[in-house]
Curated annotation (Swiss-Prot):
Signal peptide: none annotated. GO terms for cellular component: nucleus; SCF ubiquitin ligase complex. It is found in: Nucleus. The keyword Nucleus applies. The myo-inositol hexakisphosphate acts as a structural cofactor. Pathway: Protein modification; protein ubiquitination. This is F-box protein FBX14. GO terms for biological process: auxin-activated signaling pathway; protein ubiquitination. It comes from Arabidopsis thaliana (Mouse-ear cress). CDD domains: F-box_AtTIR1-like (cd22159). Residues 54-97 form the F-box domain. Part of a SCF (SKP1-cullin-F-box) protein ligase complex. May interact with auxin and auxin-responsive proteins.
Length: 623
């Protein structure tokens, strides 16, 4: 899967540029200068008709070719007329925090939006660090856009609370709606999905990824309209309820443009075989369980390998949620074409992996559990010379579990996969030497996330802090934009980050640092920093105050289980009127003791053009 990291590349927030007051125009001063020049020459000149209108038409045509948000945001800051034209031509809007502005402000500025990407809760919500029912409601957004943008075609939501009523309103309000993607969302069920499937007759994309979908015991697959569909992508691997396979098979047959299909664990290997026979044009396949039903004795099983051979276009493979090892070799025939392979749900051993990975010479993206061990990573390093992204997740996430991957595997990857650009690596132990080798062998890294699961763990060999390893990463990887640090780290590691991490936009810290100096080094030294998330670290009010000059230009700051006082939080709130400061307990307890003692449990600080939100639950205090 590469979806989340497409999200990580969304580097510029539109809310930062959504102030309704456009930049001052220089047209009046230019006009005065022209008049003075003409008078000094003693002749009259008539200006061409509507010069501003002509220039705006030219600019409008040019901006159609400008797709980068960063570039468009820069254009909007040039002058008043450019600001106006850019707003008129903006078709796609990305909002990195749903509370950074109101729907009304969005609609006032942009009149022609066809695509909306909206994010809600911060990332630490994925680790149960945010209480349930905190917020991030989609309801006000869909209500506002339903009236303002009846031509809306695409909605991509991440960590939002979406109800079935929201989905019904969406389906009824946008007759030309084509794409719905819900990532890590909650609040809705199969009833809402059924309405979208039934009423959005031009639907091309319906992707449900890592979302909590309530089972309403409704056959939502059967709700797609009869006849040929426009579907190009259908993902429902996170739906934890059985589906009507006959209806799914018929839907696949009626979807000649279908390129991406990701099924859930209730689709057996035999059923997957039937789907592949029906849709040999697939390029991305999520296999579901990858385990066969009980085949009656004497009955011949389908030729799974032949089905994969027939799907010559497959380049992305995922799923394997309840796989049977003896069937894994069936995918061998497509391995040479694969650019993405996701085993992050499969407990695969090194000896299972090796016959597969040895044929994957073109892999760019590889995700797996740490069950592949260092031995499996060495096999990846020996074959996957084109690898750009690697993610290794823990099979057993407990801090005291045995770690099957280590610095040995990391160093092997760095030596064999020198084109690597992004890595997420969970392990129980690590060495400075392995991290330093990664920095030297893979200087093109833009994302380095090392999660040493045990708290305050030093170099596994020398017993020293991990300062030098992370220091080498920020020194040698000049393009680094995202960094996650862990293990035993002193303030010195953060001094390296502040000195060399000039392009870092996202920094995640867990159980690290000695004092407020560490936080000050980062806040004063990383000019591009947009997202700062810290947990269980000894940072207090002094460190918090060191970033006062930065917070108005950052998307958010998250501090949980640190040493921040309520008074320190209030001081930030009073000094920065465009910054919202929320404090709350980890479990959503209404008891004020969670925030009125010496330290607040959680601080969530973010910029907002429209002030504090109106839907904060009782356990959230907005200072």
């Amino acid at each position: 899967m590469t979806e989340e990291d497409s999200s990580a590349k969304m580097s510029e927030d539109v809310e930062k540029y959504l102030n309704l007051n456009p930049p001052c125009s220089s047209s009046s001063s230019s006009s005065s200068a022209a008049t003075f020049t003409n008078k000094s020459r003693n002749f009259k000149s008539s200006p061409p008709p509507c010069p501003d209108h002509v220039l705006e038409n030219v600019l409008e045509n040019v901006l159609q070719f400008l797709t980068s948000r960063c570039d468009r945001n820069a254009v909007s800051l040039v002058c008043r007329s450019w600001y106006r034209v850019e707003a008129q031509t903006r078709l796609e809007v990305f909002i990195g925090n749903c509370y950074s502005l109101s729907p009304a402000r969005l609609i006032h500025r942009f009149k022609r939006v066809r695509s909306l990407v909206l994010k809600g809760k911060p990332r630490f919500a994925d680790f149960n660090l945010m209480p349930p029912n905190w917020g991030a409601q989609f309801s006000p957004w869909v209500a506002a856009t339903a009236k303002a943008y009846p031509w809306l075609e695409k909605v991509h939501l991440k960590r939002m609370f979406v109800t079935d009523d929201d989905l019904a309103l969406l389906a009824e309000s946008f007759p030309g709606f084509k794409e719905l993607t819900l990532v890590c969302c909650e609040g809705f069920g199969t009833s809402g999905i059924a309405i979208v499937a039934n009423k959005c007759r031009q639907l091309k994309v319906l992707d449900l990824m890592e979302s909590e979908v309530t089972d309403d015991e409704l056959d939502w697959i059967s709700c797609f309209p009869e006849g040929e569909t426009h579907l190009e992508s259908l993902s429902f691997d996170c739906v934890e309820s059985p589906i009507n396979f006959k209806a799914l098979e018929e839907l696949v047959v009626r979807s000649p443009f279908l390129k991406k299909l990701r099924t859930n664990r209730f689709v057996s290997l035999e059923e997957l075989h039937r789907l592949m026979v029906r849709a040999p044009q697939l390029t991305s396949l999520g296999t579901g369980s990858f385990s066969p039903d009980n085949v009656p004795q004497g009955e011949q099983q389908p030729d799974y390998a032949a089905a994969f051979r027939a799907c010559k276009s497959i380049v992305c493979l995922s799923g394997f949620r309840e796989f049977r090892p003896e069937y894994l070799l069936a995918i061998s025939s497509v391995c040479a074409n694969l650019t993405s392979l996701n085993f992050s749900y499969a407990n695969i051993s090194p000896h299972m992996l090796k016959p597969i990975i040895s044929n994957c010479h073109n892999i760019r993206v590889f995700w797996a559990l740490d069950s592949i061990r260092d031995e499996g990573l060495q096999a990846v390093a020996a074959t996957c010379k084109e690898l750009r992204e690697l993610r290794i997740f823990p099979f057993d996430p407990r801090e005291d579990s045995e770690g099957p991957v280590s610095g040995v595997g990391l160093q092997a990857i760095s030596e064999g996969c020198r084109k690597l650009e992004s890595i997420l690596y969970f392990c129980q132990n690590m060495t400075n030497g392995a991290v330093t080798a990664m920095s030297e062998n893979c200087p093109q890294l833009t994302v380095f996330r090392l999660c040493i699961m045990g708290r305050h763990r030093p170099d596994h060999v020398t017993g020293k802090p991990m300062d030098d390893g992370f220091g080498a990463i920020v020194k040698n990887c000049k393009k680094l934009t995202r960094l996650a640090v862990s293990g035993l780290l002193t303030d010195e590691a953060f001094s390296y980050i502040g000195e060399y991490g000039k392009l870092i936009r996202t920094l995640s810290v867990a159980f690290a640092g000695n004092s407020d100096k560490a936080l000050r080094y980062v806040l004063e030294g990383c000019p591009k920093l947009q997202k700062l998330e810290i947990r269980d670290s000894p940072f207090g009010d002094v460190g918090l105050r060191s970033g006062m000059h930065r917070y108005s230009n950052m998307r958010f700051v998250w501090l949980s289980s640190c040493l921040i006082s309520r008074g320190g939080c209030r001081g930030v709130s009073h000094a920065l009127p465009n910054v919202v400061v929320e404090v709350f307990g980890a479990d959503g307890d209404d008891d004020e003791d969670t925030v009125t003692g010496d330290y607040v449990e959680t601080l969530y600080l973010y910029r907002s053009l429209d002030g504090p939100r109106k839907d904060a639950p009782k356990f959230v205090t907005i200072l």
